[in-house]
Amino acid sequence: MAFELPNLPYAYDALEPHIDKQTMEIHHDKHHNTYVTKLNSAVEGTDLEAKSIEEIVANLDSVPSNIQTAVRNNGGGHLNHSLFWELLSPNSEEKGEVVDKIKEQWGSLDEFKKEFADKAAARFGSGWAWLVVNNGQLEIVTTPNQDNPITEGKTPILGLDVWEHAYYLKYQNKRPDYINAFWNVVNWEKVNELYNATK
């Protein structure tokens, strides 16, 4: 198979009480695994099997039209979730160069969190909220479904899944509560690493 489900870098219950064990098990083992399975099925026998998922999603226009939708949805789902797991950590420490850059652009970390949370909560239906690097500047964007900002030439360095499957077992229809809890488990070390890689 061309693409594989990555292991979580922590235990299923490591993010509790903010993200519960059952949600993590279903989200990783079922939802993400399904994206991988369907992506592999779509690209089987094509030259896409030899490409990285980042390269594929960044160049969706070059994907054959008969599999483009399947690759966009499932390739995006695989890429987004692979990144999402790494952006979470039970040891969240708000420090590093990216935090300084956020404070410089937004005035404070709280102002940044408020704008990010507002945009994540306002994302209609299923999708993602992102902090991206765009031409050297930080920007908050949202994408529908499993779309990823790299398709538009932007580099995601922080992402939040706001599909209901990411939070409904614990938070039901209270998406803002889930968004607030997210800040307790952000892996700022990884965010910094991704930010520094864009320089």
From Swiss-Prot:
Provide a GO CC annotation, any one. Answer: cytoplasm
Write the record's keywords in alphabetical order, separated by commas.
Iron, Manganese, Metal-binding, Oxidoreductase, Stress response
EC number of the protein: 1.15.1.1
Q: Which InterPro entries match?
A: Mn/Fe_SOD, Mn/Fe_SOD_BS, Mn/Fe_SOD_C, Mn/Fe_SOD_N, Mn/Fe_SOD_N_sf, SOD_C_sf
Q: Which family does it belong to?
A: Belongs to the iron/manganese superoxide dismutase family.
Subunit structure of this chain's protein: Homodimer.
Cofactor, free-text remark: Binds 1 Mn(2+) or Fe(3+) ion per subunit.
PROSITE patterns cross-referenced by the UniProt entry: SOD_MN (PS00088)
Protein name (Swiss-Prot/TrEMBL): Superoxide dismutase [Mn/Fe]
Q: Which residues bind Mn(2+)?
A: 27, 81, 161, 165
Catalysed transformations (reactions) = 2 superoxide + 2 H(+) = H2O2 + O2
Give the superkingdom in one word. Bacteria
Q: Which organism is it from?
A: Staphylococcus epidermidis (strain ATCC 35984 / DSM 28319 / BCRC 17069 / CCUG 31568 / BM 3577 / RP62A)
Cofactor or coenzyme needed = Mn(2+); Fe(3+)
As one GO molecular function, the record gives: metal ion binding
- Which EC class heads this enzyme's classification? oxidoreductase
Positions that bind Fe(3+) = 27, 81, 161, 165
Main role? Answer: Destroys superoxide anion radicals which are normally produced within the cells and which are toxic to biological systems. Catalyzes the dismutation of superoxide anion radicals into O2 and H2O2 by successive reduction and oxidation of the transition metal ion at the active site.
